[in-house]
Structure formats: C-alpha cells, structure tokens
C-alpha cells in the first residue's frame, strides 16, 4: 500500500512539475508562439483579449488568417533553427504544426534532465518511511538482508522480535529455524524449551509420544511404567505418554525434546510451541526422545501424563484404582474397578492401562478420552 501511494504521489507531482514548467503558452516568447499559428488561438478562444492572451495576434487577425497564408513569413522567424526544428505545414494551409526538439515550451512537452520539483526520483535517495533498497536501516517492516530489530522481521540471522523466521534466530516466541533459542512456538533443530516443541530427544511433558515413554497415566507403548490408564508394555512415567523412551512432560512428541510444553523441533531452546528435533521441555512437544513438557511426541520421551508410544506401561505395571481393561494378559494384577480383558502374558496394569504393544490410535484416543472424563 505504501508503494502504491508513493508512486501515485510521485506521478502527481511530476505532472504538476511538467505542467508548470512546459504547459503554459508563453506569449512573450515569439518562437514558441509561432508554433501553433493564429488559427489555433482562434479556435480555442484565446483571441478574446481576456487575461492578456491573444492580444498579440489582433493585427494578424485583421490581415486575414495570419501566418498561415504566407509560408515564408511563418518560416522567417525560425530560419535560424532549421537544423533543430522540423516544420510541418498542412496541404490546405489551414494549420501549422511544428515539432520542436531541444526546446522548452508547448503544453505537455517533456524535456530531459529536468531539475527540481517535489517528488523527483533518483538513485541513492535517503530517508522517508517505506523506503526500498538494500541495506536500509530502521523503520518497521523493512525488507532486506541483515535487517536488525523490528517485530516480524524475515531473514537469516534475524535477532529479537517475536515470530522471526530464519536459521539461528534468537529470542521471540514462535521463531522458526534451526538452533532457535527461547520464545514459545519456535521451530527448528536444537530448539530448547518452549511448550509444544516437536523434534527428536524431547524431554518431559505429559502426553509424550514415542517408544520407551516413561511415566504418566494413560501412556501407550511397551515397557511403560506406572501411571493410571497407561497403555503399552514397559511405558514409564506420565499419563497418556506416547512414544518410546519419552521423558518428562505430558503429551510430549519427538525424540530427546527438552523443555517447554508442545515444543517442536530438534534441540529447540526456550519458548512454548517450538518445533525441531532435540526440543527441550514444554508440554505437547513432538519429537523422538522428547524430554519435559506435556504432549511431547517422540521416542525416549520421559514422564508427563498422556504420553503415547511403545514400551509405555503394560505388563509388569503396578496399578492404581479404576483401571480400565488395563491388564491385558494372564497373571495381570489390577486395582479395584479394573475392567476385564486380561489378554497377554504377565500384563500388570495401572488403572486404565490398555494392553501391551498396542499401537492402535483408537485405543490411544479412548485412553485420552478416559483421562479427560476422569479429570
């Protein structure tokens, strides 16, 4: 929008400049006045004596049609400029049209190298809001490489501001790019912290998805340990955790994710919602081996409730009261109120734990719904 306005203003002032410089007929200049001839002024009403226009041609009007009757007279005053001027006379002798090169005058004529006037454009313009060009400094919303500051800046190595996109972005929430530091919702590898981070090696957070998820009730996956409603064998930690070896927060997704809830991305650092492998912390982080935050997805996620993944908590789990169909398998040991369906050898369940090696999304959804209803 700023570009459209700037161009429109420029064209408007350029038009004013050309009109004021060349648009007016200068009656005091004989050469410019002879370009059009008398009939031009008669047709357009310039010989009525108003505003001093046309008074110069009253004597020519008395003589007849003026300069157009005599070609020699019309050419006599411009004979010195025959090399520069090209004179075209109509066959009927009624009008005379002259094309003047390298001469000022005539309305609407444009000349090269005009100086002055507002709105002039040229290279190396300095200042003004919305200026476009490389290495522009300051101003919000500036576009260009190596821009510094301002929120929403786009480009590599951008510093600060929330929502910055690019690799090695530092700070602000929602930053996207590898090795992003801080801010919630940052996307990129090696992001640390932030909830909702996605990426491998996510740590913590309930609901982490991935193999060897640790803790939390309702976790899905083999070898999960503990928590009520956990689904899957050997799952450890938080409720509903999904993913192998998920560590920490509920619902963390991704391997080795560390930190904030829902962090996305590898080794993402800081804010919630960061994306990338090795995201740290935060709930809802997605990535294998996610650590920390709730909802992290990925293998080796530890802890958090609602984590989903293989090696969650199934056989050999020890259960609280109210477990639903958790002990699937013979020799299952259950809390009070556990629902039947002991399918599988040595399945020992927390409350609501659902079977060993169950990778079924429907069962995971049921476990999550049971968790929500139980809460």
Swiss-Prot record:
It is found in: Parasitophorous vacuole. S antigens are soluble heat-stable proteins present in the sera of some infected individuals. It comes from Plasmodium falciparum (isolate v1). Sequence repeats lie at residues 105-115, 116-126, 127-137, 138-148, 149-159, 160-170, 171-181, 182-192, 193-203, 204-214, 215-225, 226-236, 237-247, 248-258, 259-269, 270-280, 281-291, 292-302, 303-313. It comes from the Eukaryota. This is S-antigen protein. Keywords: Malaria, Repeat, Signal. Its main location: other.
